[in-house]
């Protein structure tokens, strides 16, 4: 007889509870999922998240420890006609490389999220991570959503964007930008012409940096050890390129 999984059945690290379809769709919306993405689902269960992504034309991979669930997922993908986009591998999420994902989905317990967190934070800046129900300890989400309709349990999702690592001193044209970083949140000082200004409202979103200093709004993009950006002058809508935010890390 065909294998039929049971909600709540024990697994290697967590019991298996399927993510409800309405929440899957909301998670995709939060991640701004497109056909250019490569989605990896950690602990893919019966394959529904991966198959849902594949139906949108997205390449997707499910990593699942239970071989019966992997077989079921492959069979479902074939029945749905998405084997060209949906793949499933039997493996341990803590031992399988998922670093090439542009979107990562998970429905794991908080302690497992925390165990995965260092690996996730080392992924490419801009990688989107969406979790059903459970958070990443003190790494606060960039976005939270609750689905009220057609969802009976586990109806909350959290979305993070992996931030670029920018802590340290950046040399600017005639000064420097000193940054301390806690995940996507930043603090520090901008020194121009010998005058230090504390920065505020400072944060990363992937490789994009934004902060206020001295009444000006700065935005930039970080690419490894270089930062390119611009500044709003006061409240004017006019923007100008500022060489002072063309920085290099030191």
In which residue ranges do the predicted regions lie?
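Conserved SAM-binding loop of SAM-dependent methyltransferases across substrates and taxa
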Residues: 46-58
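Central antiparallel beta-sheet cores of small beta-barrel/beta-sandwich binding domains
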Residues: 164-232
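C-terminal substrate-binding/active-site "lid" region of AdoMet-derived donor-dependent transferases
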Residues: 113-165
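A short SAM/SAH-binding and catalytic strip from SAM-dependent methyltransferases
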Residues: 98-115
């Amino acid at each position: 007889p065909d294998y039929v999984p049971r909600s709540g059945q024990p697994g290697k690290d967590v019991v298996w509870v399927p993510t409800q379809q309405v929440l899957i769709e909301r998670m995709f919306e939060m991640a701004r999922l497109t056909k250019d993405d490569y989605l990896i689902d950690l602990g893919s269960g019966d394959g529904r998240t991966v198959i849902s992504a594949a139906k949108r034309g997205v390449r997707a991979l499910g990593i699942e420890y239970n071989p019966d669930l992997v077989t079921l997922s492959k069979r479902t993908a074939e029945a749905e006609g998405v084997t060209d986009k949906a793949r499933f591998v039997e493996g341990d999420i803590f031992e399988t490389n998922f670093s090439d994902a542009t979107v990562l989905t998970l429905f794991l317990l908080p302690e497992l999220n925390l165990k995965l967190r260092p690996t996730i934070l080392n992924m490419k800046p801009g990688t989107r991570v969406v979790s059903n129900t459970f958070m990443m300890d003190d790494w606060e989400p960039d976005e939270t959503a609750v689905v009220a309709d057609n969802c009976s349990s586990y109806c909350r999702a959290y979305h993070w964007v992996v931030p670029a690592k920018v802590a340290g001193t950046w040399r600017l044209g005639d000064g420097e930008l000193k940054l301390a970083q806690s995940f996507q949140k930043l603090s520090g000082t901008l020194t121009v012409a010998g005058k230090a200004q504390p920065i505020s409202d400072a944060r990363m979103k992937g490789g994009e940096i934004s902060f206020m200093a001295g009444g000006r709004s700065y935005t930039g993009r970080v690419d490894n050890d270089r930062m390119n950006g611009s500044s709003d002058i006061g409240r004017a809508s006019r923007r100008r390129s500022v060489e002072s935010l063309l920085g290099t890390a030191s």
